[in-house]
């Protein structure tokens, strides 16, 4: 299953979710491939890697069809395709391609080639609405849209328009992140999603905790840095919820 984690708006916990959800699924002995598809490469650095030291990145696979699959092995069940600064230039090259259908399916075709044997592939998509976002959408079986307050709903609207314009049908779910029950903006978002789209909103809410922030700054997931924290509990809960939904779908 390919899950793209995206929002048009940055700063909503997108990369944090890709990293810690992947780690949580790996703890459940699911084989997981993380894909850093954002030119900021924050997922790569959160995983404790220096982008400059990564010889084979997602950009390599975009340019070399015969590139041997050489992901970074983070632990027994968790792997990473590192990001690359070159993704900005790659995006412009995609936009200039003669065949637009080929341009938006580059990532999908890469993951089809290298993804065999993985239970989950988590794509950390770039913010915005350009070719990188479109590739993340076209590749996805499901999308997770992290949101930290009602201001992020604007980004959701733009993603919805992209999906409709391209006639795509990924299953989309909203994830409330960086939640602080003391703040009215956070509570307004939670109340709105529960009232307006309960079936599309994960029951799990990711609380705002210092452990989550510090874990990423130290190149670790929350289970390495603060295994008994609220953040660890929340991402474990999310992983179980996603795995449960997949099991229910496979029974149908």
Report residues per predicted region.
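P-loop NTP-binding core
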Residues: 1-252
């Amino acid at each position: 299953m390919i899950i793209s984690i995206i929002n048009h708006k940055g700063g909503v916990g997108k990369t944090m979710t890709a990293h810690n959800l992947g780690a949580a699924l790996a703890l459940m002995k699911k084989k997981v491939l993380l894909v850093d598809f954002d030119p900021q490469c924050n997922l790569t650095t959160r995983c404790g890697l220096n982008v400059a030291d990564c010889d084979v990145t997602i950009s390599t696979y975009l340019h070399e069809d015969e590139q041997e699959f050489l992901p970074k092995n983070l632990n027994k069940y968790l792997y990473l395709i590192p990001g690359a600064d070159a993704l900005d230039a790659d995006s412009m090259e995609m936009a200039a391609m003669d065949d637009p259908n080929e341009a938006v399916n580059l990532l999908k075709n890469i993951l089809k080639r290298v993804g065999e044997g993985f239970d989950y592939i988590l794509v950390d998509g770039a913010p915005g609405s350009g070719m990188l976002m479109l590739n993340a959408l076209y590749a996805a079986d499901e999308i997770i849209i992290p949101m930290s307050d009602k201001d992020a709903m604007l980004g959701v609207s733009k993603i919805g328009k992209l999906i409709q314009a391209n006639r795509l049908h990924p299953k989309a779910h909203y994830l409330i992140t960086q939640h602080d029950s003391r703040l009215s903006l956070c509570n307004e978002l939670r109340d709105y999603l529960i009232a307006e789209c309960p079936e599309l909103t994960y029951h799990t809410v990711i609380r705002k905790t210092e452990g989550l922030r510090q874990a990423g700054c130290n190149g670790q997931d929350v289970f390495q840095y603060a295994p008994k924290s609220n953040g660890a509990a929340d991402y474990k809960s999310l992983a179980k919820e996603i795995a449960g939904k997949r099991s229910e779908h496979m029974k149908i």
